[in-house]
């Protein structure tokens, strides 16, 4: 009788072993099932013998539930066109989110070289409305940086865009021909000049040692955000637009032979590029014909007179100055050439370890470029919060979407209804601050931070400071302070009036450049784009390999399970 019971028990346990082994083998074909099921079975071996059958049954039940959940997800993914559209929409939102992660900041790699030669280059930022819908307000403007090597010459051309330039480094000569009149002026660091659309313009770097670097914005007039260069003098490189006229038109226009025209405008013409090498004698001759640029406010002011030539910004009295920095500004009042374009130009020099006082512009869109120094900027942006809201529905559709959302929010420092976009600033970085958006720039502890700013829609713009002397919050009346801050007006006054400096303040006190290291880490992650995605993919690949190895040894595992159950029965006997 006892032997019969033992035989029955042995048969039951062998059937259970076969069922568990079969279940484990089936699960081996799923992404996470095989190796987890195997671990579950191995844990059961450590249990007392009378608990092991129940443990094995629980392993099987867990795997069955996981398979059903995976099947539901797969069915949802294949549930038809609507589901596919949702998936595509989610992917599109994700791509847009990655693309629009920081729409206001552009490092050197964001610029595209449109001119490249041995003697220099011209780099241009792509149209703002292609970067983000948030930048449509300045879609008519482009940012460009010209670099010309010592003793180089930029051949004459005209464009269908107004050019407003700031000489960030070096010196040279700029010539414009407008209304039949040629004007040549010397330019140097700190000069601001305007080259109108359609005016033939050329320039030369007359220095024998330093590069000439000009930062400029182009105000497009034909197609918003698009501009073209037109080279009259030229040949093969650059190609002269004159060569595109028919031969008969060329001969009639210049009253000369086709051979001579070919030598000037055709394939036998100039082929050294847009920026060419000039001799010392040639640059000296160009300089000899140029008058000294850089007039100041002693020139007749509008409406009594017009500006002639560049405006020497750094030779003027700074509008704000203290031990933490200086701000130099030129607007339509001081430099009449800017009036037509509704643009002001400024230069900020922030002392090492200091920062600009938090502020916002009431009307202007700030387009900024860093020629020298290092630091970081913070821009407070409510639009980023609303964009994040578009992803709310993703949060209920899977853990992976939630993790991506949380990761993005951490990188962009979500605040109380706002996002703070932090950007590391270094030479060649450009950034944009829309009207009304508070921002601050901080210089590193190792060097001053220099920023050139072009402020679009400058007419009647006001800089509103949020800290330091004359900050707008101090001007609230006592009742408004008490109600707004939920504190006593005296305490509010004490905090808001703690800084006496205007415009520039001492920087954060954290030692060791913690903020800069944090920003470098964020940008390193952003440069690698989907680093987290690649790590996840790598984990999946490793799990798959482990799964395959376990699959190859599946038969041995089944035998181990059966052997374990036999040992259990034998021990009981």
From Swiss-Prot:
Keyword Signal recorded: yes
Post-translational modification, as annotated: Three protein-processing steps occur in the formation of the mature protein from the primary translation product.
Pfam families, alphabetized: Cupin_1
Signal peptide: 1-18
Glycosylation sites: 349
Compositionally skewed regions (Acidic residues) per UniProt: 403-413
GO molecular function, one term: nutrient reservoir activity
Annotated CDD domains: cupin_7S_vicilin-like_C, cupin_7S_vicilin-like_N
Biased composition annotated in UniProt, kind: Basic and acidic residues: 390-402, 525-542, 549-561
Propeptide: 19-86
Record keywords, A-Z: Glycoprotein, Seed storage protein, Signal, Storage protein
Domain Cupin type-1 span(s) in chain numbering: 104-262, 311-493
UniProt-annotated stretches for the region Disordered: 65-102, 288-315, 382-416, 498-573
Family (UniProt): Belongs to the 7S seed storage protein family.
Name the UniProt record assigns to this protein: Globulin-1 S allele
Organism: Zea mays (Maize)
Designated gene of the protein: GLB1
């Amino acid at each position: 009788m006892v032997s019969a019971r033992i035989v029955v028990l042995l048969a039951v346990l062998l059937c259970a072993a076969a069922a568990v082994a079969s279940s484990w083998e089936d699960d081996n074909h799923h992404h996470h099932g095989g190796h987890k099921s195997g671990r579950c079975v191995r844990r059961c071996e450590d249990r007392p013998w009378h608990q092991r059958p129940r443990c094995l049954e629980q392993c099987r039940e867990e795997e069955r539930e996981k398979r059903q959940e995976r099947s539901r997800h797969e069915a949802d993914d294949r549930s038809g066109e609507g589901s596919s559209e949702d998936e595509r929409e989610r992917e599109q939102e994700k791509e847009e989110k990655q693309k629009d992660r920081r729409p206001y900041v552009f490092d050197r790699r964001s610029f595209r070289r449109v001119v490249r030669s041995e003697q220099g280059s011209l780099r241009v930022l792509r149209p703002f409305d292609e970067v983000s819908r948030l930048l449509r307000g300045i879609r008519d403007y482009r940012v460009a940086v010209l670099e010309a090597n010592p003793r180089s010459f930029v051949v004459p051309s005209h464009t269908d865009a107004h050019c407003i330039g700031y000489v960030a480094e070096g010196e040279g000569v700029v010539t414009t021909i407008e209304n039949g009149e040629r004007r040549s002026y010397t330019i140097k660091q700190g000069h601001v000049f305007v080259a109108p659309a359609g005016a033939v313009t050329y320039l030369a770097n007359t220095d024998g040692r330093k590069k000439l670097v000009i930062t400029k914005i182009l105000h497009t007039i034909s197609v918003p955000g698009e501009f073209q260069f037109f080279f009259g003098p030229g040949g093969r490189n650059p190609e002269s637009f004159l060569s595109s006229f028919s031969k008969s038109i060329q001969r009639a226009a210049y009253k000369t032979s086709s051979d001579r025209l070919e030598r000037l405008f055709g394939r036998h013409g100039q082929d050294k590029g847009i920026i060419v090498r000039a001799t010392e004698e040639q640059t000296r001759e160009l300089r000899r014909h140029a008058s000294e640029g850089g007039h100041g406010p002693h020139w007749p002011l509008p409406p009594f007179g017009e500006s002639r030539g560049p405006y020497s910004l750094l030779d003027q009295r700074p509008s704000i100055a203290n031990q933490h920095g200086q701000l130099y500004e030129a607007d339509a009042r001081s430099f009449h050439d800017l009036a037509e374009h509704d643009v002001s130009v400024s230069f900020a020099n922030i002392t090492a370890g200091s920062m600009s006082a938090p502020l916002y512009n009431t009307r202007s869109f700030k387009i900024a470029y860093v020629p020298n120094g290092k630091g970081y900027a913070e821009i407070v942006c409510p639009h980023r919060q609303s964009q994040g809201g578009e992803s709310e529905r993703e949060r209920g559709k899977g853990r992976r979407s939630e993790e991506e959302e949380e990761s993005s929010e951490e990188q962009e420092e979500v605040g109380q209804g706002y996002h703070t976009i932090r950007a590391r600033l270094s030479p060649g970085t450009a950034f944009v601050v829309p009207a009304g958006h508070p921002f601050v720039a901080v210089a590193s502890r190792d060097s001053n931070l220099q920023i050139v700013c072009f402020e679009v829609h400058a007419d009647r713009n006001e800089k509103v400071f949020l800290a330091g002397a004359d900050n707008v919050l101090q001007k609230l009346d006592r009742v408004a302070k008490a109600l707004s801050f939920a504190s006593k007006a005296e305490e509010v006054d004490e905090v808001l009036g703690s800084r006496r400096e205007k415009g520039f303040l001492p920087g954060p006190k954290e030692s060791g450049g913690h903020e800069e290291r944090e920003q470098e880490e964020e940008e390193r992650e952003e440069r690698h784009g989907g680093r987290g995605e690649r790590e996840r993919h790598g984990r999946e690949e490793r799990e798959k390999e482990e799964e395959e190895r376990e699959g190859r040894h599946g038969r041995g595992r089944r035998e181990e399970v059966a052997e374990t159950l036999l040992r259990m029965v034998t021990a009981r006997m």
